[in-house]
């Protein structure tokens, strides 16, 4: 028979193990397995992800997990964030719901995940409730997706990666030069329509900044870069003469356009702001 002290110690150890099984996170990404439920197929595990981007991978899903996506720092602006997730095309074995105050709304069925399309929702819409689909054989089932927190321009659709189809104000253009994932000067070579978006082929004479390598150099003495930028189909962009200043964000490895004034118009705005000392950052325009 166990002594009172050993019995107490054993109960503490068991409680710690239960707590670890119910609450887990590594801040940015999470990888887990349904096999850890040890037969409790209706168990629900809490996952907390607090970075701007990361991934989730759930092997052999059983029961359910609740994924809480929140930024590291709390501020009034955080309520304007959208969460975008991109499932792997091999993702299967679960349905994904939005859980707001205990009310579930289907976001992605098991079949929807296989399309690999990006889906966005407002961060205030709740956590993700990911429920395993009952299976006789779970050995080949893996639910996996990437996620990013997106800060949209005012007026943007929180359920889309694209910026609103309206010209940026002078102030928005100047700020975009400082804060965008990519800033470049170039021309539009071609436009192709896709299912829910437009893909624009661009040739760049100046690449001021790119967060990741979405534009590639053509080599040679006359340095030029080429690549693609995405935007909403409703924007109705067409190939045309003249140079533009392209700014935007990189989402899931793709460049999405935000502000794109004609370069001569940007130059006028930038030079005026520079003379008045109101430009928020410097850009080499020579």
Curated annotation (Swiss-Prot):
GO terms for cellular component: extracellular space. InterPro entries: Meteorin-like, TIMP-like_OB-fold. Gene3D superfamilies: 2.40.50.120. SUPFAM superfamilies: TIMP-like. The keyword Secreted applies. One of its GO terms (biological process) is response to muscle activity. Disulfide bonds join 28-51, 84-120, 165-235, 168-259, 178-281. GO terms for molecular function: hormone activity. The keyword Hydrolase does not apply. Hormone induced following exercise or cold exposure that promotes energy expenditure. Induced either in the skeletal muscle after exercise or in adipose tissue following cold exposure and is present in the circulation. Able to stimulate energy expenditure associated with the browning of the white fat depots and improves glucose tolerance. This is Meteorin-like protein.
């Amino acid at each position: 028979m166990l002594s009172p002290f050993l019995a107490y110690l054993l109960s503490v150890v068991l409680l710690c193990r239960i707590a670890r099984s119910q609450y887990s996170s590594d801040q940015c990404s999470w990888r887990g397995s349904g096999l850890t439920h040890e037969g409790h197929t209706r168990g629900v595990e809490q996952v907390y992800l607090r970075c701007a981007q990361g991934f989730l991978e759930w092997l052999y899903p059983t029961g359910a997990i609740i994924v809480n996506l929140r930024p590291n720092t709390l501020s009034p602006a955080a309520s304007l964030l959208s969460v975008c997730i991109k499932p792997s095309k091999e993702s299967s074995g679960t349905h994904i719901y939005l859980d707001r105050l205990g009310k579930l709304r289907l976001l992605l069925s098991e079949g929807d995940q296989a399309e690999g399309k990006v889906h966005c929702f407002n961060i205030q819409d709740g956590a993700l409730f990911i429920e395993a689909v009952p299976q006789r054989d779970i050995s080949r089932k893996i639910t996996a997706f990437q996620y990013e927190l997106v800060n949209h321009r005012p007026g943007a659709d929180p359920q889309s990666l694209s910026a609103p189809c309206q010209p940026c104000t002078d102030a928005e253009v100047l700020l975009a030069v400082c804060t965008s994932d990519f800033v470049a000067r170039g021309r539009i070579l071609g436009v192709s329509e896709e299912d829910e978006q437009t893909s624009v082929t661009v040739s760049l004479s100046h690449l001021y900044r790119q967060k990741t390598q979405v534009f590639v150099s053509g080599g040679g003495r006359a340095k030029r870069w080429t690549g693609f930028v995405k935007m909403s189909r409703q924007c109705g962009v067409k190939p045309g003469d003249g140079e533009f200043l392209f700014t935007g964000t990189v989402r899931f490895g793709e460049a999405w356009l935000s502000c794109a004034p004609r370069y001569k118009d940007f130059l006028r705005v930038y030079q005026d702001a520079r003379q008045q000392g109101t430009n928020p950052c410097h850009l080499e325009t020579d």
